[in-house]
Amino acid sequence: MGELSPVCLCLLLQGLLLCNTGAARNLNELKMECPHTIRLGQGLVVGSVELPSLPIQQVETLKLESSCNFDLHTSTAGQQSFTKWTWEIKGDLAENTQASSTSFQTKSSEVNLRGLCLIPTLVVETAARMRKTIACYDLSCNQTVCQPTVYLMGPIQTCITTKSCLLSLGDQRIQVNYEKTYCVSGQLVEGICFNPIHTMALSQPSHTYDIMTMMVRCFLVIKKVTSGDSMKIEKNFETLVQKNGCTANNFQGYYICLIGSSSEPLYVPALDDYRSAEVLSRMAFAPHGEDHDIEKNAVSAMRIAGKVTGKAPSTESSDTVQGIAFSGSPLYTSTGVLTSKDDPVYIWAPGIIMEGNHSICEKKTLPLTWTGFISLPGEIEKTTQCTVFCTLAGPGADCEAYSETGIFNISSPTCLINRVQRFRGSEQQIKFVCQRVDMDITVYCNGMKKVILTKTLVIGQCIYTFTSIFSLIPGVAHSLAVELCVPGLHGWATMLLLLTFCFGWVLIPTITMILLKILIAFAYLCSKYNTDSKFRILIEKVKREYQKTMGSMVCEVCQYECETAKELESHRKSCSIGSCPYCLNPSEATTSALQAHFKVCKLTSRFQENLRKSLTVYEPMQGCYRTLSLFRYRSRFFVGLVWCVLLVLELIVWAASAETQNLNAGWTDTAHGSGIIPMKTDLELDFSLPSSASYTYRRQLQNPANEQEKIPFHLQLSKQVIHAEIQHLGHWMDATFNLKTAFHCYGSCEKYAYPWQTAGCFIEKDYEYETGWGCNPPDCPGVGTGCTACGVYLDKLKSVGKVFKIVSLRYTRKVCIQLGTEQTCKTVDSNDCLITTSVKVCLIGTISKFQPSDTLLFLGPLQQGGLIFKQWCTTTCQFGDPGDIMSTPTGMKCPELNGSFRKKCAFATTPVCQFDGNTISGYKRMIATKDSFQSFNVTEPHISTSALEWIDPDSSLRDHINVIVSRDLSFQDLSETPCQIDLATASIDGAWGSGVGFNLVCTVSLTECSAFLTSIKACDAAMCYGSTTANLVRGQNTIHIVGKGGHSGSKFMCCHDTKCSSTGLVAAAPHLDRVTGYNQADSDKIFDDGAPECGMSCWFKKSGEWILGVLNGNWMVVAVLVVLLILSILLFTLCCPRRPSYRKEHKP
């Protein structure tokens, strides 16, 4: 065999690639949505997938196979006899014969099919108990191809045992993926977790539950009973459509339905369940199903041959079944069972829509599968907040978010969220990576904004590094690293302080010596430079004086300009005889030869050097140089003095650098106490406050006439609450736009029932009995006969969101004031005030993006936020408008499908309908332009039938606040406050440091008065790091204070003004463990009590507390530092021995 040519190799490689591509196209996904908490008795999980079409010749050999690890029920895998009922044009028709009802004929034959959805009795009912899974398929066929739909039903426990597996049907591969949603036990509808509870509509008022539209998949089950008509399902349909006199429909069975993605089986019909009655009525209206065709056939055409009859089974002597013969895109299921037989007769009718009209008596069938929709009441699962934490990993951070009830929404502007999920019980976890830690990590999770302070991560990495460096002394490694790893100038000050304390006796003389050497060299260079400059100036002056008195200084022979008279005289003597005046070596007595010799002569500076030596020699030992040279930097007194001064200065810098910057929102470290304001004039505050921020203002109001009389004043403004009176408009629906052409050769357009006529929203235009040959295909001759029916309808309706219209809006804040012993609270509305005899607090106005008549759309839970629509149609809606398709309690509201039909014709071809109106739903349009709509976030929502309340977490709204306190206060009455407050520290958790934060639990006792509004702070001996406003009642009160800051020696106490608890607690040290994010909304607190800033005494107190904390902490750290100090002093003594005394040095 010869070598393959490059062309053959290329073709072979291309063939392999095409084979791989073909194999990839044969892979289909079947998604099984599971709640992430599986409990016993939760029924079945169901899913389906529509496969590509296959030739009708392959149907009889189809077999559904599985490689999944679950146990498949074998009942549906066996062969079952079907009557194959087909149609064709009669072969004896003459050419150009006009089509009529007698132009077509049908054929019946018996075939065996396996794997179709023929579910025996009790199979579904016992599937959960027996841990059996049911896999089957159904067929939608025309004359040439069939489109299979594969169904998978299994116990919900398979969500735990199976993640992914493969099914196969013919040459198609089906990837079954079990996906756990963020729902605990409910189903994902409209982006929210919905638990359908049908009994709620019977026992509770309508405003206490929600109503959702859910898909229903039903499967026909045959069950024969020996007597009675209880199982004759067709009797129920006939009763429903009020058809009497039908006695021949004796088929016995029922439908078993599954609602949504998982549910308990629903039996249809069932007298004691209104859900069953609803499904039954929908089956009667749409006997072939409410899902009309597959997505890719949304715009297609069909040719109707007409009504046909046939025999089922094929051995019958007369016709027992009828239907509508067609060609073109397949629509509904092509499998059914005959209603007139006691024993089930299964029919497979490719290219025929079998009769399903229950208002007639004969030749009817029931489909083996039925798909539709049903509206059910239920409850929405409550959501919980996320917990987000991060750990440092390489150049970025590894983060994880988890929630007890699932994560319905998570995003981040700084991280890559890959949706890798884990579930532990009811808890959902998502891991993601943040590539940058040079800025704080922001994560939006379950409607909450979480912020992870990345400097805390860097602190952890610093601790890890220093712990590794000091690993030889593990007992002190971590403690020492914790002290050193403090961010900012404070951390550098700590490091310098420890270096000075431990190694100051070595570093001080060493650094001083280096500085002195540099200064001495600089002084010498400056002095040397000045000497040379003066010498050159002197030579120039001598030269100029000689030129003035004696003439030119240029040698006449060599033309060299001399600088002194002796040099010129030597030139005159030597150059004329050809000798060098400098080295006296012989040369030619020419200018060029002598100048060339001067360039290499090494003694040309001989006369300058003689002149320099004749002058006084410079001795650079005076002034600065001498002082620097004689400085005794090794003196013990000098080193000890500098060491003490540096320690004091560094302690001050260390304490001062611990202060944080002033912020508009958040806590600012201050000293103890509160500010004092002399009431010489009225106290007025006028400011703008973000909607998500609370505000605390506390002062001591002082009598200007008597400084001893002071009244405590406390003002508390809570976060803004938005109150909207709403009108529930219903649920916005998305739909697939379908355009169908139905052409048939003869008869009027009303003669047949077209598929869109059972759709909820449709329009139809008929082109009937048109004259002209241009619109007739060759196999349908004739002029002025037949019909082309054009239909537009909306299919695959899907609920996408809740819609509320704002009727009115209010913005409120709760305002509380405490003036002396007087306390007043009121919820203040816009343009409203809280007024007392001395204080007036007004909410003047609000800057808002909401307006009455706006429409709010929620595409998920309320906590996920929503979109604001300024234009929302409520009465006359066109398809494509916001609010075009709405599901309301009164029923479905269909939009106007504005546009006109046009029949496109060509000679000898089937006509095609065209529609020039909009074909994109309003929801799809909104998604394409989602960024153009205003969005808003929601925190702490509360909803009722006609009201919606929430807090804006983004501070996108602002309130204008005005506060006036009159100067005419009754100081004699209000300054005498009988309230006595005692404080005790109960517990603390968290860590000191500005990044991590701590939670201090205080026990506050109030006596001598019934209630008192004040603020309790978390402080150490020097400063305060957090506060909370508390409305104390008589007796014991437990107060939680969240603070950030402090140091390793801080003993956090509970303080009120200048009074603190007797004992304090030490928080944990920051470490390398995961850093948990905090709610941005919780930190939006503005606290202003006018307390003085930390001054000099506060700095020393803070430094002293830190030193005591170090001493009282890990004593080994202090021991190691002292040992290092002693070693450095010994090293200093060895390197810088004491100088002998002057007397001993000059002893005679």
UniProtKB/Swiss-Prot annotation:
Which Gene3D superfamilies does its entry note?
Answer: 1.10.8.1320
Q: Cite the position(s) of the site with description Cleavage.
A: 658-659
Signal peptide residue numbers: 1-23
Record's keyword terms, sorted: Disulfide bond, Fusion of virus membrane with host endosomal membrane, Fusion of virus membrane with host membrane, Glycoprotein, Host endoplasmic reticulum, Host Golgi apparatus, Host membrane, Host mitochondrion, Host-virus interaction, Inhibition of host innate immune response by virus, Inhibition of host RLR pathway by virus, Inhibition of host TRAFs by virus, Membrane, Metal-binding, Phosphoprotein, Repeat, Signal, Transmembrane, Transmembrane helix, Viral attachment to host cell, Viral immunoevasion, Viral penetration into host cytoplasm, Virion, Virus entry into host cell, Zinc, Zinc-finger
Q: Name one GO biological process term.
A: signal transduction
Q: Which residue stretches belong to region Binding to the ribonucleoprotein? A: 526-543, 598-615, 602-613, 621-635, 1131-1143, 1131-1148
The intrachain disulfides are 34-159, 68-165, 117-136, 141-146, 183-193, 218-257, 386-445, 390-399, 415-434, 462-485, 745-780, 749-787, 761-894, 775-905, 790-913, 816-825, 833-842, 873-877, 979-1009, 1002-1054, 1019-1024, 1055-1060, 1094-1098
Glycosylated positions are: 142, 357, 409, 937
> Quick one: where's region Fusion loop?
767-787
- The membrane spanning regions, by residue number, are 497-517, 638-658, 1116-1136
Provide Lumenal-side residue ranges: 24-496, 659-1115
Annotated ranges, domain ITAM: 621-644
Q: Which stretches are zinc fingers (CCHC-type)?
A: 555-575, 580-601
Q: What GO MF annotations does this protein's record show?
A: zinc ion binding
Q: Where along the sequence does the record place the motif called YxxL?
A: 625-628
Question: What's a GO cellular component annotated to this UniProt protein?
Answer: host cell mitochondrion
Cytoplasmic compartment: which residues? 518-637, 1137-1148
In the record, the note on similarity to other proteins reads:
Belongs to the hantavirus envelope glycoprotein family.
The identity of this protein, by name, is: Envelopment polyprotein
